[in-house]
């Protein structure tokens, strides 16, 4: 088995691989051009790799290179292996492709991280743990805006008959509404803040980054250039928050009508995808985002946040903590650089804007 960069001549073999993978519902990009190609001056880009066995593609993965602020200095590291697929899930003779892809990725970039993954029950998470990666959950928070819609649709709770009956009882009485609102009554007053939805990130985002970055021990660079690459999609809501003449923070959000979502069912799901501010402004920035999504019709608002200050900001904005399957995994080399890990991890800034981005939201 040989793992090599994905080049134009391999596209027919990838199409054949995808055809064989149809029963598993998995696929690899059929274009060799990455979503984020290497461009001069850009500090965010991807490389694609494929596993070849006698000119047949048996798997593939991506590496996403980014500039990170790590302990008060900027370094290029990589996220991955992203989007890894292997024919081993259909044919046991290729079951080692996933391990070979991981080892190849570490040879190319020893300082690797992965976010998302889907929980410790996933095979990829078990592989990383066995390979001595440091793995932890990025905390998950939610705020219920419409208790009736929430209780009718929350599949995570309603999958058990007893809980389904309880949810229905709470929905049909005022107890559900009263209980949810009582649990979430922690909203701070807005200190003369102004929030606006903007089409793009400008120089004001650089000012926030330069002012706030020292409060983070591990965070992807979030200047205007990087944000314009990662957060330019038409679905995304980009909010700029100001107080007086000064911009104090920003938030990237989604507000998506869901159909058959595996956790939330058929609700309008508001998502706080990414954010940046200093510790003195985080609560106000989070409250502005929460108010906007509530006014925009969200039934439930969710966010994954790792930094202590953003977790406090969610709590004071009336969010509750729930179980998280959104994981952060650090390669042994990167974990070693971030010691003492338990102490520094409190100032990591990982959100749904990292890794593969806000998929499934």
Task: For the regions a language model picked out, list residue spans one by one.
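Active-site/acyl-donor-binding loops of N-acyltransferases
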Residues: 65, 112-181, 237, 243, ...
